[in-house]
From Swiss-Prot:
EC numbers on record: 1.14.11.-
Binding residues for 2-oxoglutarate: R165
Taxonomy of the source species: Bacteria, Bacillati, Cyanobacteriota, Cyanophyceae, Synechococcales
UniProt-listed HAMAP family: Hydroxyl_YbiX
Cofactor binding, note field: Binds 1 Fe(2+) ion per subunit.
SMART domains found in the cross-reference section: P4Hc
Cofactors that this protein relies on: Fe(2+); L-ascorbate
Binding-site list for Fe cation: H98, D100, H155
Official protein name in the record: PKHD-type hydroxylase Syncc9902_2001
EC class (word): oxidoreductase
Organism field: Synechococcus sp. (strain CC9902)
Sequence intervals crossing the membrane: none
Record-linked InterPro entries: Oxoglu/Fe-dep_dioxygenase_dom, PKHD_hydroxylase, Pro_4_hyd_alph, Pro_4_hyd_alph_FE2OG_OXY
Length: 222
């Protein structure tokens, strides 16, 4: 499994985060300031000034929510969450096909995430679109939902045709760099935990958890 979607914020939590982002034009900067040289050519949006206390506060809340999620921790095997940004896209804005830079000054980018902050009824367009071997995959999620995906993915954000799209984006450095290895470990962990919940602990299940822990050690180089 390369992609994962999950609810990260409830309705009230999402409204609380976004309440201070509306009707304040001075807090937004040109989104191209945080893009690489090639990606900047196709990036058209605005981003919350990262130097503002508001931006740092939102980033801290989102980071902690991700770290506290058992599902996201199991899927991403999180070493650190970093480079969190708030993006605002209006009519005509979008982000053409690109691949995220592999590194930032804060760490390696193994997984990217988009946390949707706007209700689906607030805008049209703005689909997060991935180029896959079998074709393209479009994602539009309700407010409070997050998607994690490999940072190596070729993806784009379709132009906004009406309304305003607010999202929080960021990156995860994983203990396990390989997407395939993370997928293997996630399936093993999910299966073992499912058996534990259904049947309780057993000596055989202890061996599976031991194998999982030692596989993480080996694949992480630790």
């Amino acid at each position: 499994m390369d992609f994962l979607t999950s609810e990260l914020l409830g309705v009230e939590e999402t409204l609380q985060l976004t309440s201070e982002l509306t009707n304040r034009e001075s807090i937004w900067l040109d989104g191209r300031l945080t893009a690489g040289e090639h990606a900047a050519l196709v990036k058209h949006n605005r981003q919350l000034d990262p130097s503002l206390p508001l931006a740092r506060s939102i980033a801290e809340i989102v980071e902690q929510k991700i770290i506290d999620s058992p599902l996201l921790k199991s899927f991403a095997l999180i070493r650190r969450v970093h480079s969190i940004l708030i993006s605002r896209s209006e009519v005509g804005d979008g982000y053409g096909w690109h691949v995220d830079n592999p590194f930032s000054k804060h760490g390696r980018r193994d997984l990217s995430f988009t946390l949707f902050l706007s209700d689906l009824s607030d805008y049209e367009g703005g689909e997060l679109t991935f180029q896959l071997l079998q074709g393209s995959k479009e994602i539009r999620l309700p407010a409070g939902q997050i998607i994690l995906y490999p940072s190596s993915s070729l993806h784009c954000v379709q132009p906004i045709s009406s309304g305003v799209r607010l999202v929080c984006v960021g990156w995860i450095e994983s203990y396990i760099q390989s997407t395939e290895d993370r997928s293997l470990l996630f399936n093993l962990d999910a299966g073992a935990k499912g058996l534990l919940a259904r049947h309780g602990r057993s000596d055989e299940l202890d061996l599976i958890f031991q194998a999982y822990a030692n596989a993480v050690r080996r694949l992480s180089g630790r």
